[in-house]
Amino acid sequence: HILLSIHRNMMNTCGGVASICRVDKKTGGMSYCGVGNITTRLFKPESVRLVSRDGVLGHEICRPLIKEIQLKRGDIVMMYSDGVVDHFEVKEFPHFYGLASIDIAKISVERFRKSHDDASCVVAKVIYD
């Protein structure tokens, strides 16, 4: 419902993209939904890409789909715009899992930003059991 509301409110604009994650601390479940060229990745021992639906908020979108994934302590959720290259891997970050969320976001934008585009990145670490 949130993405559909954003879509309606962005009509008559240049449009945009968005991803939303909701975490249930009791179950460790994360609900994810995204529209447009925005990347959401879950870093566990391996990297998992969560796929957004095609479209541009405010213009034309496919009906958003909610996906569920299980989180564990130490997992890292990263969401970034298309101004950051999509194909980097954890091995390119020394001490990746030991870094603070803000440092992971900062390094991601500094190292993997496309020179011709704006870039944004949000990182959250799972710290509960």
Across the structure, where does each feature detected by a protein language model lie?
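C-terminal catalytic subdomain
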Residues: R73, M78-M79, G83-D129
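Short, low-complexity, polar/charged sequence segments that are solvent-exposed and flexible
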Residues: T39-R41, V51-R53, I69-Q70, Y97-A100
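Acidic loop->beta-strand submotif enriched in PP2C/PPM serine/threonine phosphatases
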Residues: G15-A18, R49-E89
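A residue-level structural signature of the nucleotidyltransferase/glycosyltransferase Rossmann-like core
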Residues: S31-Y32, R49, I76, C121
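Catalytic core of PPM/PP2C metal-dependent serine/threonine phosphatase domains
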Residues: H1-P45, R113-H116
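Short, flexible, glycine/charge-rich loop motifs used to bind or transfer phosphoryl groups or to couple energy/partner
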Residues: N9, I66-E68, E110-F112
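Amphipathic coiled-coil/heptad-repeat helices and related helical stalk/stem segments
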Residues: I2, R63-P64, A105
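Conserved hydrophobic/aromatic beta-strand scaffold that supports enzyme active sites
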Residues: I20, E68, C121-V123
